[in-house]
């Protein structure tokens, strides 16, 4: 069903297509049928031959079906060109416009002037009738505001500027002087050259610049004033546009100034080529088919027929105007026909025929003419259309050219000046700058005067320069024979480009500063300085071959050996020291606890009557732990228990390892060589990682700065370091020495010099961004090749190596640095001062502690004296009390005795009670319960309670130290004051048994 439906739709689709196409085809047939079938082509020609050829060409055209549609016929209407432009205007109106001409072909004699063709163009253009010129080459006809409908099959004179550019590129001339008249054509050719050169040199390597523009008034009488300016210029290539008459004057005066001979190059336009005094060797241009009116007539007719044919097929053509008196006529078809004409591109008898927006012929061919002896013109090249590449191509046979002075060898095109303006910049060690003293009038023999460039302050210009580049300059000037004036950079910078608005312009343009800016603006001839060769600079200036190859590297300060007061603590980190200190006291505490609580911690020798040894106290444990750690002798206070002794052995092993490690590491820190760098190079992660606390920088606007901008992989790093960049390299190097900047990225030559001069600085990593230092010159400078060859000779002869050793590496200084690095380090007071200070602190601590102990002891003695006085007073008081008690007791006992004696015993005998208690020996301490009252020293005083008298006498009561003890009363003798024997009397007895009287 689907297939059947699809087949059913085919007739309907076919009917739809027929209905849609039929109106279009009908409209086309209607348009073609509405267009005129006959077309009159007017001709304003200069002679009868041209008129006849014009008529014949149109007749032949009617039989050419390629250009003429069916039922279309062309007719010619011609008039003779009149020298009177007014009469020409009337003839155009009466004989051409009245006959409804659709276009007009115009030619005239080259010597008759362009007023008549202009009159035809004005008249026809007023009615929008296209005009095709075949001989008018003035620039005025390119102005479409005046000649609104004018085309031409010949190019204007100022189009020769395009050929000039091709010739300059072929001969590799980079500087030219343009000579032109001040009329419209002269200024047009200058404008064409300047405009075209801006886009032309994008595709070629050699760029030509205009050094001098000489403009003169037509109808010259003398050209000598301009020749004086031209003679002082550097360029010797002259591009001249002048009429034949003016060219004669210019060549005459130039010959008198010897400016048409050897070394000079003249390239002129067609008019000047026909001067009767054109010098030998002049190169000129001549338009191909320039005088072939018949060829141009045929090409113009066929171009017109081609445009009308296309217009007929696309739109309706209204009839041409018929009455010159009708000023209201506005022929739109004529305007449209003019646009069709400009779009034509055909191959005709005069070559490839095409037009630009102004209606001027493009792709016109030229012959390159070389003037020989006796004004003979010899074709040495062609500028023609290349159909394969669809563009114009220059072909010149250099071997056939005879140059001015009858030379076969191409001139250099420039005058090489022998006195140059040189610029330099202060950059150690390449250029040292010294201000002259007030009493100095000249520089040293190895120095050269170098005032500030373009500085009017006389006092600020007194500088002398020396160094690597100055020695190179002195030798270079001798080798290639030039003199110079040396000056310092006006702003102290190498130069970088900035984008700046031009006055009255909407676009930004690059502008160079510093040394490069002076060279680009041609205020200096050469830069002799450590100028890095890079693509940005090479686009605007010339460079010699490098006189020193180098790259980019990193400067940093060497890691210092920390010779501080606590340098002896460096082998261990702070954390490790803290752990060791904690371990000492923890082990001491554990030793004390193990020895305290161990059941086997206290022991005594077998069969020994001595008391058991005491356990290890905390103080002794700390002393033991420190003694083992510091490897000092342990005389007392060692652990007693087995468990504590095991821990002590382990602690001794720990102490041995710690002390050995400390000793070895201390030697490594204080004696062995330190690491040279912190960074491994540009690829170090710390440089790439923007989060690291590491500052790096370069000099802003320098070649290194440009390098980082170009490198995409370094963009993150550049954004970080951009804010830290310095104005000069000197400032950055000083900050590296002070430790304010960790890494300075700069040219390796300068940094190697700084590292060789200061042993504390070192370059890190390998070179990157390799380039070289070159001598800068102006674009197209004649000195470029000579300077390059001289530098290559210097490399071969070893002169550059000599400069490296003398100025950069500082041989003796570098050897001293290497000796310093290789010699083992000797420890001095600076390294070990902390240890001595530690001993001093120990001594001071000991003295301080003994002072504290003395003060404390004095305080204790005073306190003890007060206690002794109080105790003595208490003892005396206690003795008095005891004495009274004893007397009372004695009296009471005597009374009892007297009573008992009278009642029981016989007189003359007494029975004394015996104290059976054990008394301590002399000097033995007793407990408080055994102390005798009044004995301050707690030493037992034993006295005899009774002293027996002689036989027949009654015994005397001496004393009693025991309250309540019965005292014998001997008779009625009254007790007298007791007489106490001295303490520790040898008459002491420890036992009293019986006393018998």
UniProtKB/Swiss-Prot annotation:
Biased composition (Polar residues): 987-997
Subcellular location: Cell membrane; Postsynaptic cell membrane; Postsynaptic density
InterPro entries (UniProt xref): ANF_lig-bd_rcpt, CaM-bd_C0_NMDA_rcpt_NR1, Glu/Gly-bd, Iono_Glu_rcpt_met, Ionotropic_Glu_rcpt, Iontro_rcpt_C, NMDA1-like_ligand-bd, NMDA1-like_N
Binding-site residues for glycine, renumbered to this chain: 530-532, 537, 703, 747
Cytoplasmic domain ranges by topology: 595-651, 853-997
Residue stretches spanning the membrane: 574-594, 652-672, 832-852
Record-level Gene Ontology MF annotations: glutamate-gated receptor activity; NMDA glutamate receptor activity
Topology of the protein relative to the lipid bilayer: Multi-pass membrane protein
Glycosylation: residue positions: 258, 314, 345, 397, 454, 481, 501, 693
This protein's GO CC annotations: NMDA selective glutamate receptor complex; postsynaptic density; postsynaptic membrane
Keyword Phosphoprotein on entry: yes
Signal peptide, first to last residue: 1-26
Region (Disordered): 970-997
Extracellular side: 27-573, 673-831
Main location: membrane
Task of the protein: NMDA receptor subtype of glutamate-gated ion channels with high calcium permeability and voltage-dependent sensitivity to magnesium. Mediated by glycine. This protein plays a key role in synaptic plasticity, synaptogenesis, excitotoxicity, memory acquisition and learning. It mediates neuronal functions in glutamate neurotransmission. Is involved in the cell surface targeting of NMDA receptors. Plays a role in associative learning and in long-term memory consolidation.
Family recorded in the similarity comment: Belongs to the glutamate-gated ion channel (TC 1.A.10.1) family.
Annotated protein name in UniProt: Glutamate [NMDA] receptor subunit 1
Species: Drosophila yakuba
Annotated gene: Nmdar1
């Amino acid at each position: 069903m689907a297939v059947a439906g699809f087949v059913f739709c085919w007739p309907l689709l076919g009917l739809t297509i027929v209905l849609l196409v039929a109106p279009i085809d009908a409209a086309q047939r209607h348009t073609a049928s509405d267009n005129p079938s006959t077309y009159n082509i007017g001709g304003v020609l200069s002679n009868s031959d041209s008129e006849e050829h014009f008529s014949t060409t149109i007749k032949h055209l009617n039989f050419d079906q390629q250009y003429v549609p069916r039922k279309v016929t062309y007719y010619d209407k011609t008039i003779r060109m009149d020298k009177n432009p007014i009469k020409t205007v009337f003839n155009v109106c009466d004989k051409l416009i009245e006959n409804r001409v659709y276009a007009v072909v115009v030619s005239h004699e080259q010597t008759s002037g362009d007023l008549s063709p202009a009159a035809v163009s004005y008249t026809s253009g007023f009615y929008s009738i296209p005009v095709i010129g075949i001989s008018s080459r003035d620039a005025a006809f390119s102005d479409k505001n005046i000649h609104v409908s004018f085309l031409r099959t010949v190019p204007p004179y100022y189009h020769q500027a395009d050929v000039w550019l091709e010739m300059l590129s072929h001969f590799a001339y980079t500087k030219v002087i343009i000579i032109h008249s001040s009329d419209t054509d002269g200024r047009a050719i200058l404008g064409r050259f300047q405009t075209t050169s801006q886009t032309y040199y994008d595709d070629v390597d050699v760029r030509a610049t205009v050094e001098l523009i000489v403009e003169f008034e037509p109808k010259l009488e003398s050209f000598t004033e301009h020749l004086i300016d031209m003679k002082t210029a550097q360029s010797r290539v002259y591009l001249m546009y002048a009429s034949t008459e003016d060219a004669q004057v210019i060549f005459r005066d130039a010959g008198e100034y010897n400016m048409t001979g050897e070394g000079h190059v003249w390239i002129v336009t067609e008019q000047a080529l026909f001067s009767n005094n054109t010098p030998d060797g002049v190169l000129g241009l001549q338009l191909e088919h320039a005088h072939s009116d018949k060829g141009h007539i045929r090409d113009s007719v066929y171009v017109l027929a081609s445009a009308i044919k296309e217009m007929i097929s696309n739109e309706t053509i209204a009839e041409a105007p018929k009455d010159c008196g009708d000023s209201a006529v506005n022929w739109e078809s004529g305007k449209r026909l003019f646009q069709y004409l400009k779009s034509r591109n055909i191959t005709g008898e005069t070559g490839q025929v095409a037009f630009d927006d102004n209606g001027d012929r493009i792709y016109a061919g030229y012959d390159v003419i070389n003037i020989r002896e006796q004004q003979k013109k010899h074709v040495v090249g062609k500028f023609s259309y290349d159909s394969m590449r669809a563009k114009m191509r220059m072909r010149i046979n250099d071997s056939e050219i005879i140059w001015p002075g009858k030379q076969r060898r191409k001139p250099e095109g420039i005058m090489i000046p022998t006195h140059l303006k040189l610029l330099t910049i202060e950059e150690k060690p390449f250029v040292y700058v010294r201000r002259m003293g007030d009493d100095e009038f000249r520089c040293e023999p190895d120095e050269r005067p170098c005032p500030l460039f373009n500085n009017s302050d006389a006092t600020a210009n007194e500088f002398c320069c020396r160094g690597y580049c100055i020695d190179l300059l002195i030798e270079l000037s001798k080798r290639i024979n030039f003199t110079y004036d040396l000056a310092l950079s006006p702003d102290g910078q190498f130069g970088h480009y900035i984008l700046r608005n031009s006055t009255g312009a909407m676009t930004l343009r690059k502008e160079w500063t510093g040394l490069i800016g002076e060279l680009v603006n041609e205020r200096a001839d050469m830069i002799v300085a450590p100028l890095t060769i890079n693509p940005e600079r090479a686009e605007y200036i010339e460079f010699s071959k490098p006189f020193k190859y180098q790259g980019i590297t990193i400067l940093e300060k060497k890691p210092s050996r920390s010779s501080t007061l606590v340098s002896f603590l460096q082998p261990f980190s702070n954390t490790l020291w803290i752990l060791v200190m904690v371990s000492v006291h923890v082990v001491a505490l554990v030793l004390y606890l193990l020895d305290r609580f161990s059941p086997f911690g206290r022991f005594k020798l077998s069969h020994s009557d001595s008391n058991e040894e005491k356990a290890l106290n905390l103080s002794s444990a700390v002393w033991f732990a420190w003694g083992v750690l510091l490897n000092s002798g342990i005389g007392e206070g060692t652990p007693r228990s087995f468990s504590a002794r095991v821990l002590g052995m382990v602690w001794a092993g720990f102490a041995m390892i710690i002390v050995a490690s400390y000793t070895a590491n201390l030697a490594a820190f204080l004696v062995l060589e330190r690491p040279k760098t912190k960074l491994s190079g540009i690829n170090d992660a710390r440089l790439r990682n923007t989060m690291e606390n590491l500052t790096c920088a370069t000099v802003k606007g320098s070649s290194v700065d440009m390098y980082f901008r170009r490198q995409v992989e370094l963009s993150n790093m550049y954004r970080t370091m951009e804010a830290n960049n310095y104005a000069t390299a000197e400032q950055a190097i000083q900050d590296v020495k002070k430790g304010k900047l960790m890494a300075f990225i700069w040219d390796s030559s300068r940094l190697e010099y700084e590292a060789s001069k200061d042993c504390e600085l070192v370059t890190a990593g390998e070179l990157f961004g390799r380039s070289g230092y070159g001598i800068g010159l102006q674009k197209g400078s004649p000195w470029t090749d000579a300077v390059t060859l001289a530098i290559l000779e210097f490399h071969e002869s070893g002169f550059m190596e000599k400069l490296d050793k003398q100025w950069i590496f500082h041989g003796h200084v570098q050897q001293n640095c290497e000796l310093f690095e290789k010699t083992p380090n000797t420890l001095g007071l600076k390294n070990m001062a902390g240890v001595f200070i530690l001993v001093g602190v120990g001594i001071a601590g000991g003295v301080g502690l003994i002072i504290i102990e003395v003060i404390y002891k004095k305080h204790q003695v005073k306190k003890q004296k007060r206690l002794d006085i109080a105790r003595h007073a208490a003892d005396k008081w206690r003795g008095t009390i005891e004495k009274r008690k004893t007397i009372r007791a004695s009296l009471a006992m005597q009374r009892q005795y007297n009573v008992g004696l009278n009642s029981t015993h016989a007189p003359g005998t007494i029975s004394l009670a015996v104290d059976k208690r054990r008394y301590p020996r002399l000097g033995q301490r007793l407990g408080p319960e055994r102390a005798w009252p009044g004995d301050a020293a707690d030493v037992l005083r034993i006295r005899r309670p009774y002293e027996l008298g002689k036989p027949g006498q009654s015994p005397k009561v001496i004393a009693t130290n025991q309250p309540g003890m019965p005292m014998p009363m001997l008779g009625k003798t009254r007790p007298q004051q007791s007489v106490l024997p001295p303490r520790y009397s040898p008459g002491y007895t420890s036992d009293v048994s019986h006393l018998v009287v």
